[in-house]
């Protein structure tokens, strides 16, 4: 079965969105906490149907969070076959997707009783940004983030 690159990118973005929301739970911007949440994600991904895991595919992702004091926390994730194979302090060279946000934006998500709505509000306001390294990836990111029902489905899949 051949899976189109478009489906792989959209599902990968859904996974990354859920990862950002899970990192918001921790709100501790350090490598041990990041690794803990990567490990938790990897355990959850084992419960996802194989067909969905095959659609998620592989990506190199950098997440950059500007802390309240103005410093940056940057972590790279090498996602292979839907699993986070490694986290890299400082980021990965040549990422396929870059997620940029602030500690205060994550705080808004944490405080909310409806984290999906808060996450969507922060992305709509540009406080949480996803950047694909191609125009096609950017178009797919925009389509994914505009679907609240899809975000809720993915959140339930990984965190229920």
Tell where the protein language model's regions lie, with residue ranges.
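Bacterial N-terminal signal peptides that target proteins for export
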Residues: 2-13
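Bacterial N-terminal signal peptides
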Residues: 12-22
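Feature captures hydrophobic
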Residues: 24-160
């Amino acid at each position: 079965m051949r899976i189109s690159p478009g489906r792989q990118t959209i599902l990968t973005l859904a996974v990354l969105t859920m990862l950002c929301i899970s990192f918001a739970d921790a709100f501790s911007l350090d490598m041990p906490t990041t690794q803990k949440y990567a490990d938790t994600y990897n355990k959850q991904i084992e419960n996802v149907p194989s067909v969905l895991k095959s659609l998620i595919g592989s990506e190199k992702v950098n997440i950059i969070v500007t802390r309240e004091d103005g410093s940056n926390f940057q972590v790279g994730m090498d996602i292979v076959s839907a699993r986070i194979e490694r986290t890299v302090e400082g980021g990965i060279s040549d990422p396929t997707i870059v997620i940029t946000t602030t500690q205060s934006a994550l705080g808004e998500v944490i405080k909310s009783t409806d984290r999906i709505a808060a996450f969507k509000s922060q992305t709509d306001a540009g406080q949480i940004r996803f950047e694909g390294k191609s125009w096609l990836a950017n178009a797919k990111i925009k389509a994914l983030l505009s679907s609240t029902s899809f975000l809720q489905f993915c959140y339930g899949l990984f965190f229920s």
